[in-house]
Amino acid sequence: MGKIIGIDLGTTNSCVAVMEGDKAKVIENAEGARTTPSIVAFTEDGEVLVGQAAKRQAVTNPKNTLFAVKRLIGRRFEEPEVQKDIKLVPYEIFKADNGDAWVRVRDKKMAPPEISARVLQKMKKTAEDYLGEPVTEAVITVPAYFNDSQRQATKDAGKIAGLEVKRIINEPTAAALAYGLDKKRGDSKVAVYDLGGGTFDVSIIEIAEVDGEHQFEVLATNGDTFLGGEDFDMRLIDYLVEEFKKEQGIDLKGDPLAMQRLKESAEKAKIELSSSQQTDVNLPYITADASGPKHMNIKVTRAKLESLVEELIKRTIEPCKVALKDAGLSVSDIDDVILVGGQTRMPKVQDAVKNFFGKEPRKDVNPDEAVAVGAAIQAGVLGGEVKDVLLLDVTPLSLGIETLGGVMTKLIEKNTTIPTKATQVFSTADDNQTAVTVHVLQGEREMASANKSLGRFDLTDIPPAPRGVPQVEVMFDIDANGILNVSAKDKATGKQQSIVIKASSGLSDEEVERMVRDAEAHADEDKRFHELVAARNQADNLVHATEKSLKELGDQVEAGEKQAIESALSELREAMKGDNKDEIETRTQKLAEASGKLAERVYAKQSAEGGAGEGAGAEQASAQQDDVVDAEFEEVDDKKK
C-alpha cells in the first residue's frame, strides 16, 4: 500500500508532509521551498502555472492569476464575504448556475474546488517526486470553523486532483498533533491560535494519557473564516493608495497592474516590519500621467502598520473568549499556547495573544509547517504507521432542522465530539399532511433563515392523519470528516428518505467527475509539453555543437558532407519551430548521423593540439547523447521569458 500524505491546503501557502519512521517529514517542492504559494495562473498561450511560477508573473497577468481562492470554496455568491472579496481581487468572480461563487479566467468558468485541485496536484507531485512512487491518498486540513459545504468542497478538490481524501481534519487540531506527539506523556490543555492567510481559528485541546494512548481531545473551537493575513495586507495597501493619492492626485485602484505590484510590496513590507522598525515601499514607474511617470516611495513604520491592523487583531480575541467559555475553562487552566499561521509572526499579534492568555506563546512550533506535519501524523495513524494516538475532534457549528414558525431546532450542538449521531421525532403541522420537507441548517441563530442552509429533502407518502399524529424520526449522522448525512423515517410505514448533505448548491457528482477528467487530461498535456521542451532543448544543443564544430574544422570538411550537414541543420531548425515532438526527434537523429564524424575529427584535432577532450567535440558528443536533464531547467526559464 502506498503512503498516505498530509496536505495543508492554505489560503496563501500550502505544504505537504509524510511520515518517515516515527517522524513527519516536510517535503520540499521542485523549487526547493518547503511551502508552495496557493496561486494558479493561466497564461496567454494556454499554460497553467502553479505556485512560485504563478506568483512571479502575477504583476503582468493580474486578471488571470488566482490567489486566496480558498476564501470562495463552498460559498454562495450572495454571501457578504464573497461580495467583499469581489471588491478586493483583480480576477472575476461570478454567480454560477447553482448559486455558488465561481471564477472566470480567459473565458473559462471554473469552480473554486477546480482551482484548489491544481494546488493539490502540485503537492501530490511534490510528494511523488520525493517518494518515487504514485500517491493516491491524502489527509487534507481545513479551518476548524469551516462549515459542511466548505468541507465537502475541499473533499471535491481532492477528488479532482486524483486523491482519495482519507480524512479531513481541522488545522488547529493538526497543529496540536504536531506539537504534542513528542512531548512528555501526561495531561495538559493547550490553546491553538491559528491566524493564517485567509482564516482564523482557535481551538482548546486537551492532550491526555488514556489507557496507554496519547489522546488529543478538542474541547471547543471557534473562529472567523474570513479573517487573515490577506486582510492585514489590504489595510496596508489601502493606506499606501491613499498616501499616493494625497501626494500625486492619482488613484491607483483602477489600475490592476499597479495594484498587483502594490500587493507584492505590501506583503514584503509587512513581513519586514516583523523584524525591523521601519521599511520603505519603493515602486518606480508605478503609473504615469500627462506630466510623465510617477514613482512611489513611502516610509512605513511598525507603529503605523500596527495602528492600521489593530482592529483586525482585536477581532481574534472574541473567538478566544467564546472557545474558553464553551470548553468550561478559564485562562489560568491553559498550560500552553501554540501559534500557527504565518501572520502570527507579527509581534503585535504575539503581544495580543500573550496579554489575553497571560503567558508567552510557544516558539518551538513552526507556524508554516505544523499543520502539514499534523496532517501527516493523522495519515500515519490511518495507515497504521503511528500507534497509540487517538484524535477526538468536534463539529464547529450546531446542526438542526427548520421547524414550525421558521425556528431552528438543534439536533447536534456545536463542539460535540465527532463522529456522532442524533435522533429526534417530529410530527406534521397540518391535518392530513402527506409530505414533510426536512430543511437542514447549520449555525447558532434561533431564526432558521439566519443560519446556513445545507440542503432540503422531502419525505412523502405519509398516511393522512390529524396534525401532530404522524411520527417522523429525523437522524443526523456526522462522520469523522465533519460531513453530515441526514435521514428521515415515517415510523408508521417504515418509509425512509436519506441524503448525504451536499451544499444546497455544491458540485454534483457529474460535475466532479467532469473536473476529474479535465484534470487528468491536463496532466497528460503537461507531460507532453515537458517532453516537447526536452526534445527542443536536446535539438538546440546539437545544433549549437554542430555549428561550432563546422566553424572549428573549416575547410577540413568535404563539400558533400558539409552540404548534408547544413541540410539536416536547416530541417531540424524548421522542425523546432513547430510542436511535433516526433518530428523534432527524427530530425535530431538525422543531424546526429550526418554530423557524427565531425566530433571524432574535432577530438583528434584537439588531441593533436594538446587540448584533449575539451571544446566543441566533447560538447557535440554530449549533445548527441543525452540532454534531457538540462532540458528540465531550461524549460522553466524558457516559459518565463
UniProtKB/Swiss-Prot annotation:
The keyword ATP-binding applies. It comes from Thioalkalivibrio sulfidiphilus (strain HL-EbGR7). GO terms for molecular function: ATP binding; ATP-dependent protein folding chaperone; unfolded protein binding. The lineage of its organism: Bacteria, Pseudomonadati, Pseudomonadota, Gammaproteobacteria, Chromatiales. The modification Phosphothreonine is found at T199. Residues 627-641 have a biased composition (Acidic residues). Acts as a chaperone. Residues 617-626 have a biased composition (Low complexity). The gene is dnaK. Belongs to the heat shock protein 70 family. This is Chaperone protein DnaK. Induction: By stress conditions e.g. heat shock. Keywords: ATP-binding, Chaperone, Nucleotide-binding, Phosphoprotein, Stress response. Signal peptide: none annotated. Residues 577-641 are annotated as: Disordered. Residues 577-590 have a biased composition (Basic and acidic residues). Coiled coil: none annotated.
